[in-house]
């Protein structure tokens, strides 16, 4: 099953997440099909907190991909801001 979820990157105590399309059987930070955005929970000042390619996310959801709870919340916030 294809899913859209967060993959953790960054340093210890400084998380940075990539929003990726991946097979649900792959490891959290393992192989992915496509990167569709990022989420920086500790962005400050002029740093961009979230960037999502909503067109590609809609494409994958149309093909049957499931979306994780956290990514769904990020999509909802991005749609509200746009």
Swiss-Prot record:
One of its GO terms (cellular component) is cytoplasm. Keywords: Ribonucleoprotein, Ribosomal protein. InterPro entries: Ribosomal_bS16, Ribosomal_bS16_CS, Ribosomal_bS16_dom_sf. It comes from the Bacteria. Pfam families: Ribosomal_S16. One of its GO terms (molecular function) is structural constituent of ribosome. GO terms for biological process: translation. The keyword Ribosomal protein applies. Belongs to the bacterial ribosomal protein bS16 family. This is Small ribosomal subunit protein bS16. The gene is rpsP.
